[in-house]
Amino acid sequence: MQIKPYTPDLEPAVRAFNHRMLPAGERFPESHVPDYPRLDGRRVYQDYFVALDKNQVRGGYKLMYQAFWIRDRVEMIAGGPQGAVSEGILDPQFRMVGIQALMDALRREPQLFAVGIGGMQQGFARLLKASRWAISAVPFYFRVVDPGRFLSNIRYLRQRRGMALLCEFLRRTCLGHLGVHAAQMRLPKLANCRAEIVPEFGGWADEIWNRARHEYSFVAVRDACVLSVLHSGPRLLRMRVSRGSQTIGWVVMLNTPMKGHKQFGDVRLGSIVDCMAGSGDAAQVMRCATEYLEADGADVIVSNQSHDMWRRALFTSGFLRGPSNYLLALSPRLSEKLQPLKELQRRFHLTRGDGDGPIHL
């Protein structure tokens, strides 16, 4: 088995691989051009790799290179292996492709991280743990805006008959509404803040980054250039928050009508995808985002946040903590650089804007 960069001549073999993978519902990009190609001056880009066995593609993965602020200095590291697929899930003779892809990725970039993954029950998470990666959950928070819609649709709770009956009882009485609102009554007053939805990130985002970055021990660079690459999609809501003449923070959000979502069912799901501010402004920035999504019709608002200050900001904005399957995994080399890990991890800034981005939201 040989793992090599994905080049134009391999596209027919990838199409054949995808055809064989149809029963598993998995696929690899059929274009060799990455979503984020290497461009001069850009500090965010991807490389694609494929596993070849006698000119047949048996798997593939991506590496996403980014500039990170790590302990008060900027370094290029990589996220991955992203989007890894292997024919081993259909044919046991290729079951080692996933391990070979991981080892190849570490040879190319020893300082690797992965976010998302889907929980410790996933095979990829078990592989990383066995390979001595440091793995932890990025905390998950939610705020219920419409208790009736929430209780009718929350599949995570309603999958058990007893809980389904309880949810229905709470929905049909005022107890559900009263209980949810009582649990979430922690909203701070807005200190003369102004929030606006903007089409793009400008120089004001650089000012926030330069002012706030020292409060983070591990965070992807979030200047205007990087944000314009990662957060330019038409679905995304980009909010700029100001107080007086000064911009104090920003938030990237989604507000998506869901159909058959595996956790939330058929609700309008508001998502706080990414954010940046200093510790003195985080609560106000989070409250502005929460108010906007509530006014925009969200039934439930969710966010994954790792930094202590953003977790406090969610709590004071009336969010509750729930179980998280959104994981952060650090390669042994990167974990070693971030010691003492338990102490520094409190100032990591990982959100749904990292890794593969806000998929499934």
Stretches found by the model and what they are:
Residues 95-99, 223, 285-286:
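Amphipathic coiled-coil/heptad-repeat helices and related helical stalk/stem segments
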Residues 219-241:
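Oxyanion-binding "anion nests"
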Residues 1-52, 57, 80, 153-225, ...:
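Short amphipathic alpha-helix that is part of the acyltransferase structural core
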Residues 5-115, 138-145, 243-280, 321:
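Conserved donor-binding loop and adjoining core beta-sheet/short helix segment
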Residues 65, 112-181, 237, 243, ...:
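Active-site/acyl-donor-binding loops of N-acyltransferases
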Residues 101-102, 226, 288-289:
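Short, hydrophobic/aromatic alpha-helical segments in well-folded domains
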